[in-house]
Amino acid sequence: MQSPAVLVTSRRLQNAHTGLDLTVPQHQEVRGKMMSGHVEYQILVVTRLAAFKSAKHRPEDVVQFLVSKKYSEIEEFYQKLSSRYAAASLPPLPRKVLFVGESDIRERRAVFNEILRCVSKDAELAGSPELLEFLGTRSPGAAGLTSRDSSVLDGTDSQTGNDEEAFDFFEEQDQVAEEGPPVQSLKGEDAEESLEEEEALDPLGIMRSKKPKKHPKVAVKAKPSPRLTIFDEEVDPDEGLFGPGRKLSPQDPSEDVSSVDPLKLFDDPDLGGAIPLGDSLLLPAACESGGPTPSLSHRDASKELFRVEEDLDQILNLGAEPKPKPQLKPKPPVAAKPVIPRKPAVPPKAGPAEAVAGQQKPQEQIQAMDEMDILQYIQDHDTPAQAAPSLF
């Protein structure tokens, strides 16, 4: 905690018997991160007591300094005085409210002013160690002058008529805001003080919590890239990636000739140089033809690509593959109709003379037959008997 700035003043003490005057002339709102913040009440101390002076001050000098305290700190100091000095009659503390408004802050400042006036009038309370601790006199001497404290002190001196040390309080605050806080390097004791705990209070100034200070992280600035003027050409890293295709010429392999096709993205594969026409690696049909087979020109290919069918049935059937017709089963063969055996014809009845002549003819033929005729007769008459009769 930084010690208050102690300045010599020419104002007259109102409490000469105690040598101490305590007032609360104003308050200040301190904004924190996000929606947090608290109110500090500035206590003006005017005294000639040696406990508040440094070695450079004379015994008869009257000094003044400013101390900023929060509601919770003033409440703690009030409870200490009430518990130790029960005989002292002090005004009651202002009531606690959930939401603190401007009227509540003004009411608290007025009550704190009355309480500290009563403390400064009482000789026992004015020299109590609780008051010395509350006003921060454990570390004697002033270790620096803050712009806020000095401006308030000089503003109070201007009311007493001291023109040499008086200046405008609000003008000094504006100058400090424009100049900004000075940058100090943490060395030695400053490095140890940065490790101390700082107090974080709620917006009402009631609850207190301690948290360690965080070291500010030094951001490493990236090296800015050189700015290009209007005459400099920016190098495109992908310039050669999408350039026109290039291929080797059969006449001179060392020369690169740009391809005719502007849509080609990649170079032709390198096959080890151009191949002569009569090389044995080529197919015989290719050697005889003497050149590549003619292909469709670019315009014919475009016409074929953008051709639109006029027949609606053909357009609908473009994506569908023709289904093969199912093969018809062969009809079973029709069986032939069975041959109806014919009735043997009845020979006409012959007379007795004809019958006798007819009987004599076969007998003569039988007698005239030899062995071969008999065998042939048996074969002719035996074959139909062995064949199975067909139902169809």
Swiss-Prot record:
Q: Which residues carry this modification: Phosphoserine?
A: S3, S139, S194, S249
Q: Which domain of life is it from?
A: Eukaryota
Keyword set for this entry?
Acetylation, Phosphoprotein
Query: Which positions bear N-acetylmethionine?
Result: M1
* Residue ranges annotated for the PX domain, each copy included: 19-142
Q: Does the keyword Isomerase apply?
A: no
Residues that bear N6-acetyllysine: K337
Q: Name one GO molecular function term.
A: phosphatidylinositol binding
| N-terminal signal peptide | none
Recorded GO CC terms: endoplasmic reticulum; mitochondrion
Q: Does the keyword NADP apply?
A: no
Q: Where is this region: Disordered?
A: 138-162, 174-265, 319-364
One GO BP annotation is: regulation of apoptotic process
For bias kind Acidic residues, which ranges apply?
Answer: 190-201
This molecule's function is given as: May be a modulator of IL-2 signaling.
Q: How does it assemble?
A: Binds HCLS1. Interacts with the SH3 domain of HCLS1 in vitro.
The protein's name in its UniProt record: HCLS1-binding protein 3
Q: Which organism is it from?
A: Homo sapiens
Recorded name of the encoding gene: HS1BP3
